[in-house]
Amino acid sequence: AEVAMSSALAQMDLQPLCIAGTNVLLLELPYYRRFRLKDVETIINRNDIQVVFAHIERFSRLWNKETFAAVMELPVYKQINCSSLCHARWRQRRQLLRWLSDGEVHLLGTDAHNLTSRPVNFQAAAQLLQRKQRTAELETCMELAEQLTEDGVQ
């Protein structure tokens, strides 16, 4: 599960919050518009963890363009949700596909919370990417996910 961003995280031992057996922290950025980017950078600059921003697509319309651009430029992996890809209107889907093709987004996540109202929907996103001739991007996402979860980050 993702960890909600808090300035207190910079002072904490983050290993217990990482994906089991790795040093990968799935970080959910704040939903409020005014947050301290410096707090996020402090966490990113730690040597003991690898940060992945969870469902980054949610913030493109929430924050102002400058804040979103600054976050997208940070040297971390970024993840989008399969449901966003599958259920987006054509303009947003085109943007998500562009981010994948340009290497700005690196991972797909399901954001599954249960088997009924928010089930795993990875297969639908994979099929969509194949239909849109984005098989290479799908494979890149899968390889990185495997690397991060099996090996952790060295």
Task: Label each residue range with its predicted role.
Residues 104-120:
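Short acidic/histidine-rich active-site segments
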Residues 22, 74, 103-104, 136:
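A short helix-to-beta-strand connector/capping loop
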Residues 77-80, 85-87:
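Aromatic-anchored helix/helix-loop segment that forms the rim or "lid"
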Residues 27, 88-90:
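Extended, charge-rich low-complexity interaction segments
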Residues 10-13, 41, 64-69, 90-100, ...:
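Charged helix-capping and loop-helix junction motifs
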Residues 122-154:
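Mid-to-C-terminal alpha-helical segments outside catalytic/metal-binding sites
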Residues 2-4, 58-62, 85-88, 113-117:
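Active-site environment of divalent metal-dependent phosphoester hydrolases
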Residues 1-79:
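Extended substrate/RNA-proximal surfaces in nucleic-acid metabolism proteins
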